[in-house]
Amino acid sequence: MSEYSMPRYFQNMPEIGEPTYGPDPENEQQLKATEAEFKELIEKILAAGRSDESLNSTGQLTAMQRIRALVDEGCWYPLNSLYNPAGNANGSTNIVKGLGRIGGRWAVVVASDNKKAAGVWVPGQSENLLRASDTAKTLRIPLIYLLNCAGAQLDVQEKVYPNRRGGGAPFYRNAELAQLGVPVFVGIYGTNPAGGGYHSISPTVLVARDNANMAVGGTGILSGMKPKGYVDQETAEALIKAQTEGPKVPAPGSMNVHHDITGFVREVYPDDQGVVEALKKYVSYLPAYNLEYFRVADPCEPAYPASDLYDIIPTDQKIFYDVYQVIARLFDGSCFQEYKKSYGPEMITGLARLDGLLVGVVANKQDFLMNYPEYRGEDAIGVGGKLYRQGLIKMSEFVTLCARDRIPIVWLQDTSGIDVGDPAEKAELLGLGQSLIY
């Protein structure tokens, strides 16, 4: 497609940027070392727990194998890979999540990490799940669970269930998304008692593997129910004997119950891959916009290679860099239509194209600003990266205009914060900063 609306505005934006003066091997090496460090941390967390071979030998796929089978090749973008607010020993919240494209349609995907204690709920997992549902709600795209959750880790359950953003909040959020018309799908694997059971039942479309189950309580609870109302030594010994020597209590809530009788589960499959294919099918039924509808120009590469960023952005945070050179290596054709360039010089705002789509850009300029800000007098020297009165006003205006026209914003944030002191208070920076929040 080559015919678009308003070409004089969107296809003829000014070009910015210039070639770099030359490579900076030391800076590049330091940045790549930092990238490698993060990559190693993420890989270590994903590898922790039961081995892939051990799970595969039982006919199960791992969380990442299920994700790769579900999303289009090359279209998986992890989110919050290092998020571990409670400091769990394995470095994670026992879920893997991210944005993925499924048959060309975007979705938020959350997979129970069955390598780690059968995907049990651990402290911090609820908050991580809410981040996923927040993303689905904001973008209005499907939320898909690949669920394999053995309930809560009992020795820390007091840190899992309580609070308004604790264990029950994700189930409320699933209901909220359904009311908003945002689809919530789940593929159910393994044993899912208690918190795992509610997690199974709260989405709107349920598909499952034939050996999966979901229940209010698991076999441990069934085996432990005694009329005394308390556990003494005699009861404890009987429980141990029943678990080690006696007949096993069948796991409640099998697919014979929840597919054949209750009808909660729509479809059942004999292997993990079948569940994945069913989820793909239901995603394909959903309406979706063609991106061509939103494009303002044909997609094209930036005029300068992204690899230049290793030379442009210094590892030493005391060294200024030219953020225009960064913008020139991120957006189509290195084109950028700036908004109010001479006003609020510590902030750069404007329009650019990304894959032919119109986006707003907000960035912190890095430089000394002579005789600025104006409220500090003629001899003032402002520092790039700090927020002053004019920059806050410009940002507020630009963000408001983008919100009005439903233009997404790319924010290149590199700031030391807002200006402080009585001159800043008299210049109303507190109120101007608040205007960005609402």
Language-model segments: which ranges?
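Conserved catalytic cores of soluble enzyme domains
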Residues: 2-3, 9-12, 18-21, 147-291, ...
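Extended active-site and interfacial segments that coordinate phosphate-rich ligands
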Residues: 114-136, 204-206, 212-214, 219-241, ...
